[in-house]
Amino acid sequence: GCAVLSLWGCNMPENERVTMIHGAGGAVMAKLIEKFVLPYFGGFEGAEVGLEVLDDAAVVDGVVFKSDSHAVRPIFFPGGDIGRLAVAGTVNDIAVLGAEPLALACGFVLEEGLAFGDLERVLASIKAACEEAGVFVVTGDTKVVEKGSLGGLVVNMSGI
């Protein structure tokens, strides 16, 4: 076996690091998941659509389940914002598997110094997108991290 687990083979230096391309979807992200994530979390045989399929959502006992994290800069952009993106992406990935989205969980990681006005704009956008999709946020979580560590906020949206 390899001395160092690698995305590209057995000879990756130990100081290799994650880059932005690893989070951009496609073949590079698939290799990251296959080499690093699946050895720890794969193997659940009770799923109709499980992690190994590398789909955007899972199906367990007929229930479609999705989780998606969003970290974009700027958080407001032409045509939308991080909140609308989080709802739309989650609802879309559930619908693509033929299910009707029922409920969402929304987690926030807020950077110290984020303007409350920006937070309210994101929350209002999430609410509007939920109303358009016919779903509700029914649970969630909020954490705050030190200034300079995020670039604003990260939104995780999960749904069934």
PLM features: what roles do these ranges have?
Residues 11-12, 142:
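Short linear motifs in intrinsically disordered/low-complexity regions
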